[in-house]
């Protein structure tokens, strides 16, 4: 069995879909379906069982037997960069992750987890090293601190000549693609611009967006990276992005091209995002490629075109 936490979410459900495509369906999805709309991400997936995230962690902490587990993909988290309840974020993203990590280490179960490019903050160097990290929001900090916790475990194991089972973290950059319709304000720019155009409006970008560039990565490619690392058993913390920074306007132009009409309009930059907003991200893929991962990443033009074709059927 493979367990996918956050399996009803965007990245988690795409990982499940990719596993299904490879013929694997002995999958336990763990999530919180309080927002019942997320069920739509599971309807076309072939899984063995579903469990609420609180029931799951209770059983994990009790050391319950789940039977043979081939791997755990830990994608579950509060991913809202606008959430400032630090106690909630640290309990949900940090403490929960630690419990699950130690469960896996004790049983030598491969543990592949979601980190984030939000760990880097305001920098122009995106290398998986402590010197380049400086989260701008509490979500980013929760991910940064868990990465540091994992690093400490590796250092302790090395000091005692021990080898830990596989632990792999992925610093996701700006992920977009199918199965994100439940995310509300945290859905991708492509998703929001498409909704605007379907409502008969022009696509709207924040003022100053011509200066903002992000590494926009297609969720299908993200899922492929996760499966590559499981199949190859490689540990480490790795950037998961295209290695290219593209302007928000490139996303808007790809959406406009699909619809065959429209022009970009600008709206004021939100006050609540000032000082907590990454204006530039670009994954350094040196470490990912050195590990042997050869997954090719779609450009914004190609990825958004594929995405638009899927959600505008």
UniProtKB/Swiss-Prot annotation:
One of the protein's GO biological processes: carbohydrate metabolic process
InterPro entries membership: Epimerase_deHydtase, Heptose_epim, NAD(P)-bd_dom_sf
Residues in the signal sequence: none
GO molecular function annotations of the record: ADP-glyceromanno-heptose 6-epimerase activity; NADP binding
Cofactor binding: number and manner: Binds 1 NADP(+) per subunit.
Highest taxon, organism lineage: Bacteria
Residues where NADP(+) binds: 10-11, 31-32, 38, 53, 75-79, 92, 143, 175, 183
UniProt-listed Enzyme Commission number(s): 5.1.3.20
Binding site for substrate: 174, 185, 192, 206-209, 214, 277
Record's keyword terms, sorted: Carbohydrate metabolism, Isomerase, NADP
Biochemical pathway: Nucleotide-sugar biosynthesis; ADP-L-glycero-beta-D-manno-heptose biosynthesis; ADP-L-glycero-beta-D-manno-heptose from D-glycero-beta-D-manno-heptose 7-phosphate: step 4/4
Catalytic function, reaction form: ADP-D-glycero-beta-D-manno-heptose = ADP-L-glycero-beta-D-manno-heptose
Active site per UniProt: 139 (proton acceptor), 183 (proton acceptor)
Reported cofactor(s): NADP(+)
Domain notes: Contains a large N-terminal NADP-binding domain, and a smaller C-terminal substrate-binding domain.
Oligomeric form and interacting partners: Homopentamer.
Job description of the protein: Catalyzes the interconversion between ADP-D-glycero-beta-D-manno-heptose and ADP-L-glycero-beta-D-manno-heptose via an epimerization at carbon 6 of the heptose.
Family the entry assigns: Belongs to the NAD(P)-dependent epimerase/dehydratase family. HldD subfamily.
Protein name (database record): ADP-L-glycero-D-manno-heptose-6-epimerase
Organism: Aliivibrio fischeri (strain ATCC 700601 / ES114)
